[in-house]
Amino acid sequence: RLSLVGSEMCIRDRHITELIRKGADRGASIILFPELCITSYTCGDLIQQPALLHAAEQALGYILAQTRELPIVAIVGMPVTYGNALYNCAVVFAQGRIHGVVPKTYIPNYSEFYEARCFMSGEEIGLATIRMCGQDTDFGRNMLFNIGGVKFGVEICEDMWVPAAPSLHQAVDGAQILFNLSASPEVLGKHNYLLTLVKSQSARTQSAYIY
């Protein structure tokens, strides 16, 4: 279990690296981490600070270097700057190579969620190129990944809770597995509703839905 409180970058990258190693040792092919796991979801306005954003990319670079020899795909969450905007993203990588960066499409701005203060929606981004950790990689919301013969798509938290979820398009394009990075808080009665939602999304997309 990965804690999502605080912004201790030097601890977070090592913790994530350790979990990726454990996953590889246990024979896992893909490991999914929570939304914004590198910085934590609860950074508040600190998430916009250049120092924190720089540290996040450095942390990703450390993880890439430390897991380069491991035969496992990892999906982590982190804030990413593209152009003049900040996006809540999933980064897909394996053996030191970044395969793509997926921005969150639907940005919640209600109750305890106020992401619109910090993040832009990735809805208008079709497919672009972004440079991270010295690598040029794809950046877009409806990417389909094919690693090791397995086709999969990625969306982030709120993206699943809307009628036109990105995963629907990814499934039509051939995704066999759909991954959702989330950092939703525990609320009384929410778990059962969430379980129903995940089952429904899996049935609608005829895929394995990993949340």
Indicate where each model-derived feature is located.
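Single conserved hydrophobic/aromatic residue that forms the stacking wall/gate
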Residues: 1-6, 11
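Active-site beta-strand/loop signature of hydrolases that rely on acidic residues for catalysis
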Residues: 23-46, 75, 96, 159, ...
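Short, basic and Ser/Thr-rich N-terminal targeting/leader segments
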Residues: 26, 70-74, 84-86, 138-139, ...
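Short glycine-enriched, charge-decorated loop/helix-capping segments at active-site entrances
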Residues: 45-53
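Short beta-strand-to-loop element that shapes/binds the nucleotide-sugar donor at the catalytic cleft/hinge
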Residues: 77-80
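CN hydrolase (nitrilase-like) catalytic-core segments centered on the catalytic cysteine
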Residues: 54-75, 155-211
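Active-site catalytic loop in hydrolytic enzyme cores
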Residues: 58, 85-173, 189-197
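Short amphipathic alpha-helices and their capping/turn segments at secondary-structure boundaries
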Residues: 14-28, 167-168
